[in-house]
Amino acid sequence: MIISIIIFSILSFILGVIVSLVSCFCKVKSNLSLINDIDELLPQMQCAQCGYPGCYAYSQAIVDGNENIYKCIPGGKEVVLKLENLLNKSDHRGNFLESLEDSVTYSIVEIDENNCVGCSKCRLVCPVDAVVGTYNFRHTVLIDSCTGCNLCIPLCPTNCIKKKIMFYE
Protein backbone atom coordinates (compact mmCIF):
# COMPACT_ATOMS: atom_id res chain seq x y z
CA MET A 1 0.00 0.00 0.00
CA ILE A 2 2.76 2.46 0.93
CA ILE A 3 4.75 1.51 -2.16
CA SER A 4 1.78 2.26 -4.42
CA ILE A 5 1.32 5.67 -2.74
CA ILE A 6 5.00 6.51 -3.24
CA ILE A 7 4.90 5.39 -6.89
CA PHE A 8 1.70 7.38 -7.47
CA SER A 9 3.28 10.49 -5.87
CA ILE A 10 6.43 10.21 -7.98
CA LEU A 11 4.41 9.74 -11.17
CA SER A 12 2.21 12.73 -10.26
CA PHE A 13 5.29 14.88 -9.69
CA ILE A 14 6.85 13.84 -13.02
CA LEU A 15 3.57 14.46 -14.85
CA GLY A 16 3.30 17.91 -13.22
CA VAL A 17 6.81 18.82 -14.38
CA ILE A 18 6.04 17.66 -17.93
CA VAL A 19 2.80 19.68 -18.04
CA SER A 20 4.63 22.77 -16.76
CA LEU A 21 7.34 22.46 -19.41
CA VAL A 22 4.81 21.94 -22.20
CA SER A 23 2.80 24.97 -21.10
CA CYS A 24 5.95 27.12 -21.12
CA PHE A 25 6.79 26.10 -24.67
CA CYS A 26 3.21 26.69 -25.86
CA LYS A 27 3.23 30.15 -24.29
CA VAL A 28 6.41 31.10 -26.18
CA LYS A 29 4.85 30.03 -29.47
CA SER A 30 1.72 32.10 -28.84
CA ASN A 31 3.90 35.09 -27.91
CA LEU A 32 5.85 34.75 -31.16
CA SER A 33 2.59 34.66 -33.06
CA LEU A 34 1.34 37.77 -31.26
CA ILE A 35 4.67 39.56 -31.82
CA ASN A 36 4.42 38.81 -35.54
CA ASP A 37 0.78 39.98 -35.66
CA ILE A 38 1.70 43.28 -34.00
CA ASP A 39 4.75 43.66 -36.25
CA GLU A 40 2.54 43.26 -39.34
CA LEU A 41 0.30 46.12 -38.16
CA LEU A 42 3.21 48.54 -37.70
CA PRO A 43 4.31 50.64 -40.71
CA GLN A 44 7.79 49.02 -40.96
CA MET A 45 9.59 52.34 -41.30
CA GLN A 46 12.26 51.25 -38.77
CA CYS A 47 12.38 54.94 -37.80
CA ALA A 48 13.16 54.37 -34.10
CA GLN A 49 10.84 57.23 -33.10
CA CYS A 50 9.24 54.88 -30.56
CA GLY A 51 12.59 54.41 -28.84
CA TYR A 52 13.29 50.96 -30.28
CA PRO A 53 15.63 50.18 -33.20
CA GLY A 54 12.84 48.74 -35.32
CA CYS A 55 9.22 47.70 -35.47
CA TYR A 56 9.91 44.10 -34.42
CA ALA A 57 11.73 45.18 -31.25
CA TYR A 58 8.81 47.49 -30.41
CA SER A 59 6.41 44.58 -30.99
CA GLN A 60 8.40 42.42 -28.57
CA ALA A 61 8.31 45.15 -25.93
CA ILE A 62 4.53 45.47 -26.27
CA VAL A 63 4.01 41.72 -25.84
CA ASP A 64 6.41 41.56 -22.89
CA GLY A 65 4.36 44.29 -21.21
CA ASN A 66 7.27 46.72 -21.07
CA GLU A 67 5.76 49.25 -23.46
CA ASN A 68 2.42 50.81 -24.31
CA ILE A 69 0.84 50.73 -27.76
CA TYR A 70 0.76 54.49 -28.28
CA LYS A 71 4.34 55.22 -29.35
CA CYS A 72 4.24 54.58 -33.11
CA ILE A 73 4.12 58.13 -34.48
CA PRO A 74 4.26 57.18 -38.20
CA GLY A 75 1.36 54.75 -37.73
CA GLY A 76 -0.86 57.44 -36.23
CA LYS A 77 -4.46 56.86 -35.18
CA GLU A 78 -4.98 54.02 -37.63
CA VAL A 79 -2.26 51.80 -36.12
CA VAL A 80 -3.27 52.65 -32.55
CA LEU A 81 -6.86 51.60 -33.25
CA LYS A 82 -5.72 48.36 -34.91
CA LEU A 83 -3.42 47.55 -31.98
CA GLU A 84 -6.21 48.26 -29.49
CA ASN A 85 -8.48 45.93 -31.44
CA LEU A 86 -5.86 43.15 -31.68
CA LEU A 87 -4.91 43.33 -28.01
CA ASN A 88 -8.45 44.01 -26.75
CA LYS A 89 -7.35 47.21 -25.05
CA SER A 90 -9.22 50.46 -24.87
CA ASP A 91 -7.64 53.89 -24.87
CA HIS A 92 -6.24 54.08 -21.33
CA ARG A 93 -4.51 57.37 -22.04
CA GLY A 94 -7.62 59.49 -22.16
CA ASN A 95 -7.39 61.96 -25.00
CA PHE A 96 -4.42 60.35 -26.76
CA LEU A 97 -6.28 59.67 -29.99
CA GLU A 98 -7.71 63.17 -30.03
CA SER A 99 -4.25 64.63 -29.48
CA LEU A 100 -2.99 62.86 -32.59
CA GLU A 101 -3.62 65.66 -35.01
CA ASP A 102 -3.59 65.03 -38.73
CA SER A 103 -0.31 66.95 -38.82
CA VAL A 104 1.85 64.67 -36.68
CA THR A 105 5.53 65.27 -37.29
CA TYR A 106 8.35 62.93 -38.17
CA SER A 107 11.97 63.55 -39.03
CA ILE A 108 14.14 62.89 -42.04
CA VAL A 109 17.59 64.16 -42.98
CA GLU A 110 18.56 66.58 -45.69
CA ILE A 111 22.00 67.02 -47.25
CA ASP A 112 23.27 70.45 -48.25
CA GLU A 113 24.68 69.33 -51.58
CA ASN A 114 26.78 72.48 -51.98
CA ASN A 115 28.86 71.55 -48.93
CA CYS A 116 28.95 67.78 -49.51
CA VAL A 117 32.46 66.47 -50.23
CA GLY A 118 31.30 63.02 -51.32
CA CYS A 119 33.02 61.03 -48.57
CA SER A 120 30.20 58.41 -48.67
CA LYS A 121 30.20 57.92 -44.89
CA CYS A 122 26.50 58.71 -44.77
CA ARG A 123 25.70 56.40 -47.67
CA LEU A 124 27.56 53.49 -46.09
CA VAL A 125 25.86 53.79 -42.69
CA CYS A 126 22.28 54.26 -43.98
CA PRO A 127 20.29 51.12 -43.07
CA VAL A 128 17.67 51.67 -45.78
CA ASP A 129 19.89 52.97 -48.62
CA ALA A 130 18.15 56.34 -48.61
CA VAL A 131 21.40 58.20 -49.35
CA VAL A 132 22.51 58.03 -52.96
CA GLY A 133 25.71 59.18 -54.58
CA THR A 134 29.17 57.92 -55.41
CA TYR A 135 32.52 58.51 -53.80
CA ASN A 136 33.89 62.06 -54.37
CA PHE A 137 30.57 63.26 -55.77
CA ARG A 138 27.71 65.01 -54.02
CA HIS A 139 25.15 62.87 -52.25
CA THR A 140 21.43 63.33 -51.77
CA VAL A 141 18.69 61.76 -49.66
CA LEU A 142 15.68 59.96 -51.11
CA ILE A 143 12.99 61.53 -48.94
CA ASP A 144 10.51 58.69 -49.47
CA SER A 145 13.06 56.14 -48.23
CA CYS A 146 14.57 58.02 -45.28
CA THR A 147 13.35 56.76 -41.90
CA GLY A 148 14.90 59.55 -39.84
CA CYS A 149 17.21 57.27 -37.87
CA ASN A 150 19.84 60.07 -37.94
CA LEU A 151 22.78 57.65 -38.01
CA CYS A 152 24.40 59.68 -40.77
CA ILE A 153 24.41 63.07 -39.01
CA PRO A 154 27.38 62.59 -36.63
CA LEU A 155 29.51 60.98 -39.35
CA CYS A 156 29.46 63.93 -41.75
CA PRO A 157 32.86 65.71 -41.73
CA THR A 158 31.40 68.95 -43.14
CA ASN A 159 28.18 69.00 -41.07
CA CYS A 160 26.12 69.31 -44.23
CA ILE A 161 23.49 66.80 -43.04
CA LYS A 162 20.66 68.31 -41.03
CA LYS A 163 17.53 66.91 -39.45
CA LYS A 164 14.37 68.12 -41.15
CA ILE A 165 10.94 67.95 -39.53
CA MET A 166 8.13 66.83 -41.82
CA PHE A 167 4.36 66.73 -41.28
CA TYR A 168 2.04 63.85 -42.08
CA GLU A 169 -0.88 65.00 -44.13
Curated annotation (Swiss-Prot):
The record ties this protein, via InterPro entries, to:
4Fe-4S_dom, 4Fe4S_Fe-S-bd, 4Fe4S_Fe_S_CS, Elect_transpt_cplx_RnfB/RsxB, Fe-S_Ferredoxin, RnfB/RsxB_Proteobac
Q: Where in the cell is it found?
A: Cell inner membrane
Residues that coordinate or bind [4Fe-4S] cluster 2: C116, C119, C122, C156
Highest taxon, organism lineage? Bacteria
What range(s) does the 4Fe-4S domain occupy?
30-89
Keyword annotations: 4Fe-4S, Cell inner membrane, Cell membrane, Electron transport, Iron, Iron-sulfur, Membrane, Metal-binding, Repeat, Translocase, Transport
> In what residue span(s) does the 4Fe-4S ferredoxin-type domain sit?
107-136, 137-166
Cofactor requirements of the protein: [4Fe-4S] cluster
- Residues at which [4Fe-4S] cluster 3 binds: C126, C146, C149, C152
**A GO cellular component entry from the record:** plasma membrane
Question: What's the subunit arrangement here?
Answer: The complex is composed of six subunits: RnfA, RnfB, RnfC, RnfD, RnfE and RnfG.
What this chain does, per the entry, is described as: Part of a membrane-bound complex that couples electron transfer with translocation of ions across the membrane.
Entry protein name: Ion-translocating oxidoreductase complex subunit B
